[in-house]
């Protein structure tokens, strides 16, 4: 598009540090930068408000369709607003705050079981890997909510370890699927495939999901008046989706609702380990709770929620580009006219580091021992973590805060994620108030450097702690 030639451009490699490079460019040249001949990145709050405004006309780009196999649709990849609204009406009810209150005991039981596993590790090994256990917990929670029974990662970690083969690679795998789709097409004919174990795990997950769906259908037939509630009970009764579509839909819930929650919890505990003042203030607030508190009480703890909000600002798991398409007729965004059909991408990574909106968002200290790309990748480790900024947030801060996506397509599972994060943080710190990051087995801060693909993960895929 000829009119985009006037915009400054950058080259973005597939290296897990794309967002740091994009941030560097936006800081250097202004609020808009061209990343491909037909796509721009924007870090301009008025433009972000317009792009993500409900019924604003900026539809998701065709890129989203490349996230799923041919013939498969998920809530994430739906483009047409009417169809999306219909799906959301069917799916949103069980994920409302009211409905989640009914499953709180189940979620709490999984949290307690996870903390017991961590305690067992600490007693027998002296360290425990929170990345592993938070992922196991979140996966069991969302799988039980989806299918009526958990996959069983907490109860049978060795037998179900294949799930981690998939979740560990999901971010980079989707980056390759969307950028080099031929790798997946030709992969079945190649003796060596970069995602062999992850693809095998997808097959096992599908097999487990199909069996669980069949069992739940049988359960509904046996107890039609009072079946065990799941996220998809309404869909079973409405008979709007076949088993193939239900399998993929539930699988997408597991992908979206496990790794994201686990990584957020990991970085929250990591941030607490790095700042004793934050730890002590949070512990003092938690100690005011009764012994058998409920989640609703946690919703009203100001400092706990400030810590969670700041974690989601600094360590937003889905902080990569959210591509939308400029409507026919074009639009002027960030001072530039963009023709209709141009892809415009916003991303939480740069918005959450906009100093005009979030004062002092960084405290980066270059280290000469790191290479250029490594410095970009570890940049976020030194980003300033300040929960107090959320005591009286400005409207600009609220509008720029996008850990769950833009207003028009907000993540449907954000209430569930926040419930898990609040319950887990509180119960874990009650059990282990003096938790510290371990230095055993070569554990270091650089293991927590963020790898940014479709979703973010710590580079070392671990957080070893002692308590």
Swiss-Prot record:
InterPro entries to which the protein is assigned, alphabetical: Cyt_P450, Cyt_P450_E_grp-IV, Cyt_P450_sf, Cytochrome_P450_monoxygenase
Instruction: Output the Pfam families linked to this UniProt entry.
Output: p450
Q: Keywords in UniProt for this one?
A: Heme, Iron, Metal-binding, Monooxygenase, Oxidoreductase, Signal
Pathway stated in the Swiss-Prot or TrEMBL entry: Secondary metabolite biosynthesis
As for what it does, the entry says: Cytochrome P450 monooxygenase; part of the gene cluster that mediates the biosynthesis of azaphilones, a class of fungal metabolites characterized by a highly oxygenated pyrano-quinone bicyclic core and exhibiting a broad range of bioactivities. In the first step, the non-reducing polyketide synthase azaA forms the hexaketide precursor from successive condensations of five malonyl-CoA units, presumably with a simple acetyl-CoA starter unit.
For the ligand (heme), the binding residues are: 411
Q: Do you know which Gene3D superfamilies this protein is assigned to?
A: Cytochrome P450 (1.10.630.10)
Q: Which family does it belong to?
A: Belongs to the cytochrome P450 family.
User: Could you tell me what induces this protein?
Assistant: Expression is under the control of the azaphilone cluster-specific transcription factor azaR.
Q: Name one GO molecular function term.
A: heme binding
Q: Which CDD domains match?
A: CYP_fungal
Source organism of this protein record = Aspergillus niger (strain ATCC 1015 / CBS 113.46 / FGSC A1144 / LSHB Ac4 / NCTC 3858a / NRRL 328 / USDA 3528.7)
The name of this protein is: Cytochrome P450 monooxygenase azaI
Q: Needs which cofactor?
A: heme
The signal peptide stretch is 1-28
Q: Which domain of life is it from?
A: Eukaryota
**What are its E.C. numbers?**
1.-.-.-
